[in-house]
Amino acid sequence: MDTGQDHMTTPGIRKIDALASRGDPPETVAIGYVTGESTPIGFSFVSSEELVPPRLEYVVVAGMRERRGDTTVTVDLLAQVTNITADVITLDDRIDFLGAETVLNHRVTFPPRLRVEAAVVGYLDSDQQTVRAARNAVLPGTRVHLAPDELLRKFFARSSGSSITLGTLMNRRTVEVALDPNGLSRHLAIIAQTGAGKSYLAGKVLEELLGLGATIVVLDPNSDYVQLRKLRGDEAVPYEHARKAPNHDRIQLYRVPIAGRQRYPDDLCGPSSRYTIRFSGLDGEEICDVAGVPSNAERIREAVVNACIRLRRDRVDFNPRFLAQHLADFSGVPLDDFDGDATDKGAGTVAAHRPDLDDAAAQLDLIRAIDHATTVTVTKRERGDNHSGPTPPRATGSRGASVDDREMVAARSALRYIRKLEKYPIWSQSTIDLNAILQPMKLTVLDLAGAEKGVMAYTAEWLLSNLWQRALGGELTNPVFVVLEEAHNLVPGGRETTRASRIINTVASEGRKFGVFLIVVTQRPSKISDDTLSQCASQLIMRLTNPDDQKAIQRASEVVSQSLLDDLPGLNQGEVVVLGRLTRVPAMVRVGGRVGAEGGADINLIERLERSRKEVEDERFASRRTPPRIVAPIKRQPFS
């Protein structure tokens, strides 16, 4: 993402340069005078065409008198321009076309009147650290000046050794904005619609945090962070030959071993470890969640849980294939009749089973299925057909059907889900070592691109649950930041939940007390759990046009005003609003350049199309240079 800072000059900077050309410092030249009614939270002033500041520029009213306890102090009151209106007395909204033409042709118009509205930001207390809200209104006739850079730095800058440098003020590229890391103690939300630059922004925050010594774990479903070890600009250079980022040796990468389906090949990303999960370490309910078994399919889930219990009782270290074979043996059907598709291939077994077995209609379907399955099974036995696995003892249920037949039908239904798991390449005899992830000043990227949603939710649940247990036991020696990319898929709002929802909400509400902090990244805040989003006391918000998403962040944050929401659709790529505990006052920032290579950039369609066209042109050129093949004429034989 091009931040544009090297070649873009904002209107605010041009205004300051114009004032400086007069020979006077910009802050000594009055750009307007307060007029009309003012309040402690805002005022209006008139200005001229030459001096009017752009919208969102900062202005100052010097010499304001404020009451502090029993004393009165003189302060410099900072304000931000929120709106500008222009009108001409002889060209008001009542004039028609002919009247306007007459006025302009006879040059009887007056100079435009520029009226500027400003919202009060506050003033610095005597410690030069605390921002106080104004208690008095600015008096009409008071001079208004452009805020000097030095004053703005006191509001927005911090010590470079203990802060996160984010970028510069949107209208002042000479004023850096630094974030207070303590603002992350109550979690951070990074929110932006697709294409606004949220992954670039998140990468900027992460590399700054790593430099401060943080332990960070990133759940990366789109391979946005897999190239952080390389310097920006070397995205297309193989890792072996690329320039390295300053802390590349403190960044490690785990990848799902999916050949041919990775967004970036290994030679671009550099050394990585396999992201693996020990299948037999999952309990039955976890296996059902990863396999996508509906939560209300109680009998199917029970069949899987019981199968796992039997295998563990026999001390079997099983994988999905072994579990599927066990279910097939238990239900008396060949395993090959179930290939993991939505429907069974076995003609002699129940072809489809509804997962919602709790309602009356589904129960009736189940009984009919059991009757059919029982008949088929008995017929097979009478014929002497082979079937793998022992024949379970039969017991009579309340409706006359065998209880074991019910279990057999559920086991057959479970096979459709368990066979799918065999296609996942993440299963192994061991799970990644959590201790290797929790080292100080370590950034771990779990590249889950290509993995199913169930695997992602399980990974989030496994990671946060283990972290949480260590945190509660006092075993975390350093703070840990967990980045949840595409968070709306892991902790959705409304009635929808995932396996990770409960632990994410728990960490969101209690994690700050135990050193576990969330960085929630999403482009759909309206689809994320309010319990999680409302706990993020700091927000970095980029361009956002969807009304539902705007309302969601307004519900979740006390400091999001309607005027700020109105500004969000007009933000350019790389511009962000900083809210909450990260800064002393809200700031509108142009994100600065980052060090690490970017993985989340959009595909350059022009380059791809040119490459495709060149391939075709090369093929055409090669075909023209190849001499035509001479084919001998076919001698026609006379008809006999």
Briefly describe each language-model feature range:
Residues 208, 223, 227, 233-234, ...:
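P-loop NTPase motor domains
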Residues 1-193, 200-207, 212, 225, ...:
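Basic- and hydrophobic-enriched, low-structure N-terminal and domain-boundary segments
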Residues 574-640:
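Conserved P-loop NTPase motor module
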Residues 213-217, 440-443, 477-481, 513-519:
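Loop/turn-to-beta-strand initiation segments
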Residues 190, 194, 496, 525:
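The conserved Walker
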Residues 199-261:
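Walker A/P-loop NTP-binding active-site region of P-loop NTPases
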Residues 499, 506-590:
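Conserved ATP-driven motor cores of ASCE-family P-loop NTPases powering translocation/secretion/packaging/pilus
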Residues 188-189, 217, 445-447:
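Short hydrophobic/aromatic beta-strand immediately N-terminal to the Walker A/P-loop
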